[in-house]
Amino acid sequence: MTTKQTSYIFVSGGVLSGLGKGVVAASLGFLLQNRGYKVGVIKCENYLNIDSGTINPIEHGDAFLCEDGLEADMDLGTYERFLDYDMGHCNFTTIGQIYKKVIDRERSFGYKGEDVEAIPHITDEIISRIKKAGQGHEILIIELGGTAGEYQNMLYYEACRIMKAKQPNRIINVHVSYVPLPQHIGEPKTMPTQLSIRTVMSMGIHPEFLVLRSIAILDKRRRYLLGLKCSVPGNNVVMSPDVKSIYEIPLIFAQQKFDKKILKELNLSYRKSNLDEWHKLVKKISKPKDKKVKIVIAGKYFATGDYELSDSYAALIEAIKHAAWHLNTEVDLKFINTEDIEKQGVKLIGKPDGIIVPIGWGSRGAEGKISTIKYAREKKIPYLGLCYGMQLACVEFARDVVKLKKADTTENNPQTPYPIIHDIPMSSKYQTIKGKNTSMRLGAYDCYLSDKTQIAKIYKKYKFCKKVSDIYKKKNNITAVGNCVISERHRHRFEFNNEYRDILSKHGMIFAGTSPNNMFVEMIELPKKIHPFFIATQGHPEYKSRPNKPHPLFIEFVRAATK
């Protein structure tokens, strides 16, 4: 399909950040996809970073890890969970990527002596990226990052204006804005939205639709008057109220016929939709729960000033919820900063039903994580370690069970006499080279599971693995033990040191999964006779969980917590 056949929907935001443009874009995409349209999506970010991988999660939330190794904005996780297909490099761009591409082209004489400027050269590159993302899709949704009026995103808006001028019948604009309801006044105030629309219009963009974020649904009269003041037809003012679960939003939009109105505006035909499965999902989420469990997430990316943010672990929290809904269980999440555990001890953990140590970097809070893992192991509390949570579980086991007291990671202690975790070789054969002295093992990798392990049984139970023959393994030089193959996403630059595999095995640790060449330890567990549920993975199963397809490891972790 050529780009001329693709229709484009730009989603912008006003008044404040964090409105939920990503949820609006994903919900609209889901509804159009449900009608049989091939829907693509791309997030256009404002920052100069090439990707989200080097940004502290406290600054911009959880960097979402894609199958192809892209470290992207967390909105791509929202897209995956709603649209149920994998995102990648074509679904994400930053202004840093755009500038780098243009400058590299200029340095290579790609502009043949032209005076390279923001307009048209930067805007042309933006438009080129958008059209490339639209290839193969009937509809492409473009989420513009940031808030209307910020200087950082003005070139995205200019690119949108240019595209609209060239293809007026193929492009529409949806503006998401906030309508506050101050308690001391007692009525919604629409002036912030009016000013936001004026800002967008001053850039030559006239939204066809207005999506209002508010505590509650505005009455018809206010929607009509607001539409009149914003030059948006009253029927095209759509409500997106606060809800208990974001998965309710597609149904709320469908009730307002948002998708039908979009198709009419684009002169696209109506196709039948069937939202039965989504209704079942929302019903499952909202119905009373049979059980309740308390889960501790022990990390360090929670606090920002006096406030606690959950966005730093957005994908993890979603994965836990998906599993809990599957088991009709209510989850009470408790966030504990492991630096506080270092100062005050494991008494902070209390008596949870399950403990998770997620991704992390560096020495800050690492000893608190190790203490948490020891607490989970000795108290026989169900434990799930993710990435750093697996590495530090190996360190804790080496210190406290094998009695290698000074065991550590070379990341935190380069001089450790027992480097249980060490650097992955700096080679493109094993890692993605991101820059000078900067590398990472990124993206989806296969893992072979030992057949009789708990982990293999879990993946087989939910049909998340495939079985291969010994003949296939021999033909492809696969030396890993086991015939059960899975794939998980990875994001790390340190690995388990295989010199310590035998001694840890002799003391009870099971190396349940490895890379095909047996080089990388991917999964560990403790036998059930030692611990009811102690599983850790170098991968990131949280990024593959979907609301209607919860990840097996999270299902069984939550199940263990209920016991």
Where on the chain are the PLM-derived regions?
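Flexible phosphate-sensing "switch/lid" loops adjacent to ATP/NTP-binding sites
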Residues: 1-329, 339-354, 362, 369-375, ...
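Rossmann-like NAD(H)/NADP(H) cofactor-binding core
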Residues: 40-42, 334, 384, 537
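Short gly/pro/ser/thr-enriched loop/turn and capping motifs at secondary-structure boundaries
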Residues: 48-50, 391-394, 413-416
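Amide-donor transfer/coupling interface in amidating biosynthetic enzymes
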Residues: 79, 122, 215-236, 241-322, ...
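Glycine-rich, charge-decorated loop segments at or immediately adjacent to ligand/cofactor-binding or catalytic sites
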Residues: 182-189, 391-400
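Cofactor-cradling patches in redox/metallo enzymes
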Residues: 358
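Repeat-solenoid scaffold signature
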Residues: 377-393
